Amino acid sequence: MRIILLGAPGAGKGTQSHFISKALGIPQISTGDMLRAAVKEETPLGRKAKEVMDSGNLVSDDIILDIIKERLKEDDCRSGCLFDGFPRTIAQAEALDREGITINHVIEIRVEDSSIIQRMSGRRVHPASGRTYHLTFNPPQQQGVDDETGEPLIQRVDDTEETVKKRLAIYHEQTSPLIEYYTGRAAEGSLDSPRFTTVEGTGKVEEIRDRILKALGA
């Protein structure tokens, strides 16, 4: 089964991707990781991608698709895979279709923007250990300091309310249209049409996991 997981930044895709991959025994395919590996290994595609990146440009969808096609030929993808971070745009989704890369199920983890802003802007981190707290859901015993060391906690730049709002705006502009695209593809009802399911992304991590696995029939 080939699966695409959609959802805004902070919706919990990373956590749930790990659960799905483990439960179904399929690899999680990260286009970013594959691109870095291809560049490091100096494969023909990696050299081409490095040339583009060194010139300050974005790697084209064509190169990304070629890297994906190479990855899908590997043995661990025979039973399927979970796409991580791809597609991000309708152009990329259409390219997958053109290349005949069939997607079986698209899952959208839906969380309201206000909840995501609360989730992310409330995070505080102890830099040395990586211990993470949340002002509302998992506060430190003493405000502003790590429970174990008493050292100050910080808010990462990525977690500031302003940054989160910007990331959400980009998501709604670029990636949200994919929901409409895949809803339409699912409605076609053809043999190569994916199923599309929206899963409520609030609640305990395990509850969300169970909703997703139920939707996938796992």
UniProtKB/Swiss-Prot annotation:
One of its GO terms (biological process) is AMP salvage. It is an enzyme of class 2 (transferase). Keywords: ATP-binding, Cytoplasm, Kinase, Nucleotide biosynthesis, Nucleotide-binding, Transferase. ATP binds at residues 10-15, 123, 132-133, 203. Residues 30-59 are annotated as: NMP. Residues 122-159 are annotated as: LID. AMP binds at residues 31, 36, 57-59, 85-88, 92, 156, 167. SUPFAM superfamilies: P-loop containing nucleoside triphosphate hydrolases (SSF52540). CDD domains: ADK. InterPro entries: Adenyl_kin_sub, Adenylat/UMP-CMP_kin, Adenylat_kinase_CS, Adenylate_kinase_lid-dom, P-loop_NTPase. GO terms for molecular function: adenylate kinase activity; ATP binding. One of its GO terms (cellular component) is cytoplasm. Its EC number is 2.7.4.3. It catalyses: AMP + ATP = 2 ADP. It is found in: Cytoplasm. Pfam families: ADK (PF00406), ADK_lid (PF05191). Pathway: Purine metabolism; AMP biosynthesis via salvage pathway; AMP from ADP: step 1/1. Belongs to the adenylate kinase family. Monomer. Catalyzes the reversible transfer of the terminal phosphate group between ATP and AMP. Plays an important role in cellular energy homeostasis and in adenine nucleotide metabolism. Consists of three domains, a large central CORE domain and two small peripheral domains, NMPbind and LID, which undergo movements during catalysis. The LID domain closes over the site of phosphoryl transfer upon ATP binding. Assembling and dissambling the active center during each catalytic cycle provides an effective means to prevent ATP hydrolysis. This is Adenylate kinase. The lineage of its organism: Bacteria, Pseudomonadati, Chlorobiota, Chlorobiia, Chlorobiales.
